[in-house]
Amino acid sequence: QEEALKAYVASALPRSTRQIGAFIEREFGVIYESRAGLIALLHRLGLEYHKPEVVGRKLDAEKQQAFIEGYEKLRNALGPDEAVLFLDAVHPTHAARPVGCWAPKEEKLAIEQTSGRQRINIHGAIDLETGQTRMIEAETIDAASTIRLLEALEALYPFLAMIHVYLDNARYHHAKLVQEWLAQPGRRIKLHFIPAYCPHLNPIERLWGVMHKHVTHNKCYATSREFAGEVLSFLREKVPQNWPQLCDSITDNFRVIDPKDFRVLA
């Protein structure tokens, strides 16, 4: 019976213990009155509750490994007059983002719905060594906002000889305007492009998640201006100020994601 149960779970991937309990009752005539008891049985059989990861079809494990090795080589050889930053864009929307939380059993929780769904466009970068950030609010994220951000990074580090910037392969990051700007005499920025479809290799993606946890989850802002102010204040001021507490959540502890290591669901 236990082997049949394991085979059922492996094949059907049921989403709830109720489904599993119904299978056990239907096939073996056994009724589990206690959900905890059923969960204990599943654990004893080597079964766990999983949330599938989202894995890109075009992920290239070899390119990821080469990128990680190249990044580690650069970090290990980094001079005192150099810095490394990670760059990306984010588009927070002025909307309620409810998440689960503990509360008294008798209370019903709610978040006031916002009147609109305006979003803000932020082009930003972070230095993992210091927690320093530069966040540019823009009408659109494009080559112009990229150049504004790169200029802000040079202003942030006026005495460094080289600023290494890691970023994704968005078209505007490769734009002719950006290339022309980089070619100007005296520029001190070198771009390093992260392999395609690999947001897990850009730590600033984790910063966006931390931002939502602290600013948007289970919170309501009366106006889009108030919302934008809180988001930008967190990214520009609170992240550097609280970097010792936040740094463990925003790291360059990279890993290779290979689709071959997963059972990809159809």
Where do the PLM segments sit?
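RNase H-like polynucleotidyl transferase catalytic core
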Residues: 108-115, 183-203, 219-220
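RNase H-like two-metal-ion nuclease catalytic core shared by retroviral integrases
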Residues: 61, 168-169, 176, 192-216, ...
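Major-groove recognition helix of helix-turn-helix-like DNA-binding domains
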Residues: 33-47
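A short, amphipathic alpha-helix used for macromolecular contacts
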Residues: 1-34, 78
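Generic structural signal for small/hydrophobic residues in well-ordered secondary structure
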Residues: 5, 20, 38, 88, ...
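Extended, low-complexity cationic-aromatic segments
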Residues: 66-151, 252, 257-266
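C-terminal anion-handling pockets and recognition modules
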Residues: 37, 80-82, 204-266
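Acidic, metal-coordinating catalytic cores used for nucleic-acid/nucleotide bond scission
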Residues: 16, 27, 93, 141, ...
